[in-house]
Amino acid sequence: ACLVGSEMCIRDRPKRLINFMVVVGKSEDSATRLLGDIQAELEHNQRIIADFGKQQGNASWQDGEFKAANGVKFLACGRGQSPRGLRDREARPDYIVIDDLDDDELCRNEKRVHDITDWVKEALFGALDVGRGRFIMVGNLISKNSVLANLTKTKGVHVSVIKAIDKNGEPVWREKWTKEEAQEYRDFVGYR
């Protein structure tokens, strides 16, 4: 903010968009691996370093939990672990990302899917900083009986669907798939 009228200028540092990120996977190990990818980008991606400076913190920089030099806290959490009470000093989680929470074993058990859906909606969503949290779940829809399928039916949830093949039969990720590879994969796996 800049007050000019009184010939006095006050400059505030820009407010961080994220203070405390929690990455959630189907297990603590998978969440730790996902968080490790973020950690590696902060350490070695020269574009990030050029734009934001070195982010490897001096204190705690370990697998599964670390704090970047800019003060942002990162934590890995496995499916079903209690997120209640998570905080870093005064900061509560304000960005939660769930990646590939569903697996084949879970999706075969309707009660477990229901229980994990409740855990996501109550415990995990409830751990967010009130009024400023962002909550994202990404994954493949591997079954109609899945946590992802249940959450897409929840009122107020914004759903983005990205299909591997566009309406013309072309792969959306052309750098990864040829048209033939994408069609062979779809023919084998099918569409859910």
Where are these regions (language model features)?
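Conserved catalytic network of the ASCE P-loop NTPase/AAA+ motor domain
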Residues: 1, 88-90, 127-131
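Single conserved hydrophobic/aromatic residue that forms the stacking wall/gate
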Residues: 1-5, 10
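Post-Walker A helix-loop "phosphate-sensing" segment adjacent to the P-loop in P-loop NTPases
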Residues: 11-18, 43
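Conserved RecA-like ASCE ATPase "motif II neighborhood" in helicase/translocase motors
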Residues: 64-123
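Non-catalytic, compositionally simple segments
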Residues: 104-192
